[in-house]
Amino acid sequence: MEVTHMLKITKFGGSSVANAEQFKKIKNIIQQDPTRRYIVVSAPGKRFAADNKITDLLYLLDAHRKYHVDASSVFKLIKNRFIEIKNELGLKQPIEKELDAFYTNLNQMSQAVIVSRGEYFCAKLMAEYLGYAFVDAKDIIRFKLDKSIDWDATSAKLQAKYAQYDHFVFPGFYGTSANGHIQVFPRGGGDITGAILAKCLHADVYENWTDVSGFLMADPTIVKNPKGITHITYS
């Protein structure tokens, strides 16, 4: 058997973790390549056109909290989504209790904590499903007071986890501020998280997966059979 020391950081977006079937596809992708050892995930996205992204529901949950509106129906949608994934995959971790504790303590949480929980819970389920360690972004990604990345601190913490674990799953989208509080990137920031891991761990390749192969000239949910873009420049 050929031994390779190549290191890949592999990021899966929201549509790629939308349900249990998508989790199964990810496991197959990971098993096809032993260099895919460090995985970054987004929060579950839409399963179908009229569906809700978990992060959108979390922002709605925060708005209900802010304006003192009953949020139980919104929370139920969020909770059921994660429980459905857990049950369909036969996972064992008591995520129901952690979800309930999250809702119970909602009024004590900042918006950043609330909206980052989609990635957090998704990464915990993915870690169990793959048999990988779960590494929480809040313990690793560090921001400076000006909200830029503290590269020295972040790199040191990532290198320590790299030395500790051969494989781990990492939630995208958030880290910890200079004041010790959860801080999030702009929407779509899970891609930034993946790039940070790739830079700090000196990865050979950074893969960013979606549920659509390649680059298309139009949104396939709007335009039927759009043509692909075979060559594209970074600039």
How does the language model describe each region?
Residues 2-235:
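Nucleotide/pyrophosphate-binding catalytic subdomain
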